[in-house]
Amino acid sequence: MPRVTVLMPTYNVAPYVKEAIESVLRQRYRDFELLVVDDASTDDTLAVVRSIDDPHIRIAAFDNNVGLAENLNRGLALIDTEYVARMDGDDIAEPFWLEKEVAVLDSHPEIGICSGGFERFGTVQSLVRFPERHEDCMANMLFECSVIVPTFRMSLYRDHGLRYRTDAFPAEDYRFWAECLRVTKIYNLQETLFHYRMHPTQICTARRKEQQRKVAEVRRYMLEWLSPDFTEEEKSYYTGQFMAPQIASRQDYNERKSFCGRLVAKNRSVGHFDEAALRHRLDKHLRLTLYSTIVERYFKEGYSIPKYLHYLFGGLALKTGWHYEIRFLLKSLLLKGN
């Protein structure tokens, strides 16, 4: 029996799945099987998969479509290896993906999930890195999913009963890793391990509004773990105005800053989050929203420097006062990358 199962759920990815499978078959780490779990595709996905003759491939084809989350659970139920590596049928893995993630899990028994960086390609292009240390990952999970295409211990499924939740779709990954955080640690390698294809038909593009609602639910779940004492009003504020990408007024900024202080204070009584990591991530959130606000307000239309200064000092700067704008403009621009 191999040590690793690469779990690849598929549904109507015929144009991309061959390239995805071939990238798995090129892995330098060889002690693996590739389990393709097809969720009743209506295109040629299965035909493409079956045309690839390789002993590493195992196919589980289902006639009933159950959706991504439950399809992942069907796949997990078929796995009996030590590790599971998760990959979609339209992405491309680097040849050292499994090698590097398995090495981390082998050498650090306290770590249950190893993930890494990735590159978006297609309709959107960018490099993405998540926090490396577990403490920073936890704090970042209050805002966004910090795990993608990971290798994880099958014991999370066997011993802790963790499953992908169908009611969390299309943010099922975020919810799954948020639940895993309660029983294990995460480590993120700081290098590109795979390439994440962006295209109009993928779930995160086609169902953007629904995904945003489900992401808000996971953020609420994370907040409730930080402290069970938040009121419903505070939870709604956290998933709503606090997470808004831009700041509406000086009062809005002050309210956000005050709420950050409450988060730190509440965490002290429970202690689930490292305080330094939490403070750093909250400060980053304030800086990024300030930066986004300033860019949207003053630079989006390509103002010249004289026009920008006239606008800034003319008192039109969001009714917050010029000293506020200048101070945080400089702070945001200087610290955005940290």
Task: Name each model feature, range by range.
Residues 96-128:
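Conserved donor NDP-sugar-binding/catalytic core segment of glycosyltransferases
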Residues 38-47, 64, 88:
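A conserved acidic beta->alpha catalytic loop
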Residues 1-25:
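N-proximal low-complexity "stem/linker" segments adjacent to membrane-targeting elements
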Residues 77, 116, 134-242:
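Conserved nucleotide-sugar donor-binding catalytic segment
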Residues 84:
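Short aromatic/hydrophobic "clamp" motif used to bind/position activated sugar donors
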Residues 15-18, 43-51, 92, 96:
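Acidic helix N-cap motif at the loop->helix transition within catalytic regions
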Residues 198-338:
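C-terminal subregions of glycosyltransferases and related glycan-biosynthesis enzymes
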